[in-house]
Structure formats: C-alpha cells, structure tokens
Amino acid sequence: MFRIIKWLIALPVGIFIFFNAYVYGNIITYRAVAPHQTAFMSMRMKQFEQEGRDVALDYRWMPYNRISVNLKKALIASEDARFAGHGGFDWGGIQNAIRRNRNSGKVKAGGSTISQQLAKNLFLNESRSYIRKGEEAAITAMMEAVTDKDRIFELYLNSIEWHYGVFGAEAASRYFYQIPAAKLTKQQAAKLTARVPAPLYYADHPKSKRLRNKTNIVLRRMGSAELPESDTD
C-alpha cells in the first residue's frame, strides 16, 4: 500500500519535472530559432479537422524589424500597456481578473500579459483552469528570465491567431490587406489588433459593431504605447 502511495505521488511530480525541463529546453532554443509550429496552432488545426472544416495552416515567420511599428504599438496599447516595464506579470490586472472570476464563479478573465499569452500559444491549450494558469505562470517566469523583451514580442507577433488557420503578423497582413506586415498603416494595425481577443468570432462576424468600436479605442491608445528599448531609437 505504501509503495502504491509513493508511486501516486512520484508519478505526477515526475511528469511535472519532465514537462518543465522540456519547456525550458524549448525556451532556450526559441531564443534563436523560430518555432516550426506552436502547441496552440496544432490544437486549433486538430479542432478544425474534427469539426469538418477545410482549413489550411497559414503561418509565415517574419523578423521583428520587418513588422510595422504601428502593429507593435497597437498590440501593446490593446493587450499589455506595461509590457516594456514588467517582468512578465501585471499584478494589478491579475487581481482584477481574480475578482471577476470570483464574482462569476468561473475562470473567465485571465489578466494575461503578452508574455503569458505567448506561454500559452507556444506550449499550452486554451483550456481555462487554475492549474493551467499555474503552468502558464511557470512558463512565463522561465521565459522572462532568459529571453529579452524584443524576442518575446517577436515570438508573440508571429504566433497570434487572426482568423481560421491564419497565424502571425505576416500571414494576417497578407490575408486581410495583401501587403507585407512591414507596410501596415495605423488604421490597418488597429483593425487587426481589435480581432485578437476573439479572432474566430470576428471571422464569423466581420461587420460587428464591437469590432469597429475596439478599433477606434486601439487607435486612440496607440500614441501612448511604450515599446521595448530597441524600438524607441
């Protein structure tokens, strides 16, 4: 009996250690190498297949300096205004999210920073639970410890979901505007950014009033967006 209890304790601990070692190894690799495909992309494409959707993956890696500053500012203004200065976590946002979750009785709001969103995109799925948020936090801490802000943002820009099968700034720019990501205007960048919280909803509701309103909000906030140091020169 005691041996069984030991195994019941040791097995999940071993899985946890192995998973985090795997993640850390990939984080080190991704400092210099572009991901072939993220866990979220794989999950999403499998979901489309199960739903009987004929969707092809459109994912085109683009270096950081070949992505429009307009898009960078729009995303920071919308998703994580304190990105340039925090260590991966927006504690005020997390506290607000916890309060909203308590009030609703469910894990809805996440208070996720760009770094946390990237952790989810690279290694996790879209399930919502406190265990998954804990995994996300651990990955975020590891990533922030060994990866500079420009690289974190570059990985994020290239892994965002924008439409059915469309991932990354370059694929989105080509899909919606038939131009490279480097040439996105402020208006185009704001429109793309407005889709980020719910890309598949807006894919099905392209004339949504919420999408127009969010675009205008992003446009107003872009001027005060603070980019990582290398983009401020």
Enumerate the predicted regions with their spans.
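Juxtamembrane regions of bacterial inner-membrane/periplasmic proteins
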Residues: M1-D233
